């Protein structure tokens, strides 16, 4: 089984005041670095899904994949699936750049839950579909789904009967959408220290 990984960082961060969330720091480290360090060891190859100037990620040494048509996170998933398929991977594991505490066993648990088919993460009764596993075989169906104007990750997961992989720690999926979420993540870090 060849699993590739993708950090979703193609959003505009409007709730964060229009900041590129990848460039925010938590505990003195870039958010994109947090996610790269957690997801990278779980996959064979890792890339970043982002629009705008790719030079801002040069320090990470990872491929940067642009959306063909930015239409939400699924546009990034499609670019990632095409990249993974071209390199002979079986599936892509995605995690958003604003989820710094993403579990170190995300990929294997998603893989086990879905037995290689689509799977999404769940913790504390909430589903986190941007933390998901997508077989390369769904790429063209995703392209058609996006072309039909659909954009919801949860909707696409449901369309493929995605399995749910349960995780014990809700904080692992803490999503930094607004400045107060970043403050909460900083306070969790201080508690752990
Ligand atoms: N490739 C790609 N990723 C996206 C797109 N829109 C959102 N994302 C990513 O999907 C994840 C979840 O999106 P949000 O939490 O809404 O982030 P966002 O869109 O940057 O923030 P808001 O503008 O406040 O909604 C984040 O990691 C985003 O970077 C897009 O059009 N293309
Ligand atoms: Mg958004």
Swiss-Prot record:
Cited function: Transfers a GMP moiety from GTP to Mo-molybdopterin (Mo-MPT) cofactor (Moco or molybdenum cofactor) to form Mo-molybdopterin guanine dinucleotide (Mo-MGD) cofactor.
First-tier enzyme category under EC: transferase
Entry's free-text remark on domains: The N-terminal domain determines nucleotide recognition and specific binding, while the C-terminal domain determines the specific binding to the target protein.
Record-given protein name: Molybdenum cofactor guanylyltransferase
Entries under NCBIfam families matching the protein: molyb_mobA
SUBUNIT field: Monomer.
Cofactor(s) recorded in Swiss-Prot or TrEMBL: Mg(2+)
Documented EC number(s): 2.7.7.77
One Pfam match: NTP_transf_3
InterPro entries tied to this protein: MobA-like_NTP_Trfase, Molybde_CF_guanTrfase, Nucleotide-diphossugar_trans
Main location: cytoplasm
Family, per entry: Belongs to the MobA family.
Entry keywords, A to Z: Cytoplasm, GTP-binding, Magnesium, Metal-binding, Molybdenum cofactor biosynthesis, Nucleotide-binding, Transferase
GO biological process terms held by the UniProt record: bis(molybdopterin guanine dinucleotide)molybdenum biosynthetic process
Assigned GO CC terms: cytoplasm
Annotated GO MF terms: GTP binding; metal ion binding; molybdenum cofactor guanylyltransferase activity
Source species: Cereibacter sphaeroides (strain ATCC 17029 / ATH 2.4.9) (Rhodobacter sphaeroides)
The keyword Cell cycle is assigned to this record: no
Binding-site residues, GTP: 8-10, 21, 67, 98
Location(s), subcellular: Cytoplasm
CDD domains in the cross-refs: MobA
Enzymatic reactions: Mo-molybdopterin + GTP + H(+) = Mo-molybdopterin guanine dinucleotide + diphosphate
UniProt-annotated binding residues for Mg(2+): 98
Gene (UniProt): mobA
């Amino acid at each position: 089984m060849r699993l590739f990984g993708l950090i979703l960082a193609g959003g505009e961060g409007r709730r964060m005041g229009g900041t590129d969330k990848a460039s925010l720091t938590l505990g003195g480290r870039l958010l994109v670095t947090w996610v790269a360090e957690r997801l990278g060891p779980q996959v064979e190859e890792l890339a970043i899904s982002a629009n705008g100037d790719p030079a801002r990620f040069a320090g990470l040494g990872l491929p940067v994949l642009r959306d063909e048509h930015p239409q939400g996170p699924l546009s990034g998933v499609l670019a990632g699936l095409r990249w993974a398929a071209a390199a002979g991977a079986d599936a892509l594991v995605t995690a958003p750049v604003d989820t710094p505490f993403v579990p170190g066993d995300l990929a294997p648990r998603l893989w086990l839950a879905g037995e290689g088919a689509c799977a999404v993460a769940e913790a504390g009764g909430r589903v986190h579909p941007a933390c998901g596993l997508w077989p390369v075989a769904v790429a063209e169906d995703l392209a058609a789904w996006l072309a039909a104007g659909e954009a919801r990750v949860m909707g696409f997961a449901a369309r493929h009967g995605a399995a749910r992989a349960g995780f014990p720690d809700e904080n692992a999926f803490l999503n930094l959408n607004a400045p107060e979420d970043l403050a909460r993540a900083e306070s969790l870090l201080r508690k752990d220290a």
